[in-house]
Amino acid sequence: MKKTITLLAMSLLAMSCCGEIVKTEVDVIPQPAEVAVYEGELDVAGASFKADKELGEMALKAIDKFEGQLVAASTKESGSAKAQFVFKTDKNLACEEYSIDVCCNKVVVKASGLNGVLYAIETIKQMLPEQIYTGAAACCEEWELPYMKIQDRPRFSYRGMHLDVSRHFFDMDEVKKYLDIMAIHKLNVFHWHLTDDQGWRLEMKTYPELTQVGAVRKQTLIGHGGRSRKYDGIPYGEGLYYTQEDVKEIIAYAAERGIEVIPEIDLPGHMLAALATFPELGCTGGPYDVWGRWGIADDVLCVGKESTMVFLENVLAEVAELFPSEYVHIGGDECPKVRWETCPHCQAKIAELGYKDDEKYKAEHYLQGYVTSRMEKFLAEKGKKLIGWDEILEGEIAPNATVMSWRGVEGGHEAAKLGHDAIMTPYTHLYLDYYQSKDVENEPFGIGGYLPVEIVYSFEPFTDDMTEEEKSHILGVQANLWTEYIPTNEHLEYMLLPRMSALSEIQWCQPENKIYERFLDNMDNMAEIYDILGYNYAKHIFND
């Protein structure tokens, strides 16, 4: 059936211009769904622009920006050539779908709104000289687009990238740069990991102490956590957090690029920054320190105390108010139960709820399920959906929770079988703090492992034994960038690129369009974009 639809689509493409199709691929990442390239080119230097106002204010702003870049880079005033860009509204297209038709003297772009317009512009920009990204004059370059027809849409609706800003903080300009890189690759979800044992990075009006105390650790571990107990002796984190005005600015910046921002408040584990601020939230009463090392701490929130649950609800209420995203991520990963096993408050709550050990889980796992379910219900009252790492499957999963599957694909598949939505982000393929080369002595520091571009690119979220119903619950794919060993933006970009390019084709392309050799050829063009934008990137695939 899919083959029939594709053949029909290609037939329609062939009818859109005179002549025969000469290519069915373009030098674009991610590769568009359906492409037909014909003989002939259109010089678009100095082209005029016309746009349908129904596309919306943000889409029109994006079109104006593109026009300005083209005028500046091609060194011709708008309207000095015969070519014209025409942006039209087509409500029959899905929100992220678009079409491009280059024929005669026109480039006709159709979309139903902002995201389709953004993706069409990005596709066009990648086919023009790289100076289009900076507006730098490039008078000697050829500003030609081939006669072509593109019909494009993403495979997955959720195309995410995560950033941990707790272990190491990245300022506003660096976060915006991260969003810019995402936009080039047509990613649409920024997962912002704002709290962890090593620092609380989000201003809370209800609890201002969380960034006064919880943002600052006394010192930081030198080297790998399992091999070293040496510390640098330097306090880290004073003033390193985002104000709520900062957050609003980032959300607006992301929205202009078609990106949704999902906040993560990791609970009930990974909470030493909060425990150091409010020791009464813990099982032992402390004292606690904002952690200066990496790994998993035994000290977690005392969820047997109602006061702890009220604290969590107050925090999440403020987060839900601040972030317009339909989702809030509550973590739920790596929460040791050792403190709960001996805590009178937690044991009393277990008894009250009637939890008991069984052949699959201990009672304490069900206690965490109680926390997740309560937070899910609370967030639902605020109009939000809950996401958690795949540990939330242990015990009783909250009724409407979305599972982020990081320990492999099994958690996502289990969630889908249970009728829950899932997002695939397995460490085996999508943890970008892993090394990109086996020659680790000559690589920037990583957490370990080996994850070159080829392995990233090879990831497929579906398995042959999945039913169509189960597949429908897989919302998409995300890569994660944990920053224990990534203290600078230069290091961050190196770990991110070019692996994000590989990620984008997993997220966007149908399996039949995912061809590694074609991808490598297209990466030469992408490297020119990286270079002109000044990005620091790993060059292994270009040296092979």
Model-inferred region functions:
Residues 63-75, 186-187, 381-383, 418-422, ...:
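Structural alpha-beta junctions
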Residues 93-299, 303-309, 314-327, 374, ...:
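Feature activates predominantly on carbohydrate-active enzymes
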Residues 45-51, 159-164, 233, 295-301, ...:
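Glycine- and acidic
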Residues 1-25:
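Bacterial Sec-dependent N-terminal signal peptides
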Residues 385-401, 406-544:
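Flexible, acidic glycine-rich loops studded with aromatic residues
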Residues 274-280, 284, 289-401, 406-418:
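Active-site neighborhood of glycoside hydrolase catalytic domains
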Residues 17-157, 380-393, 397, 524-534, ...:
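Acidic, contiguous N-terminal accessory segments
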Residues 58, 169-171, 197-203, 268-274, ...:
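Flexible loop/turn segments at secondary-structure boundaries
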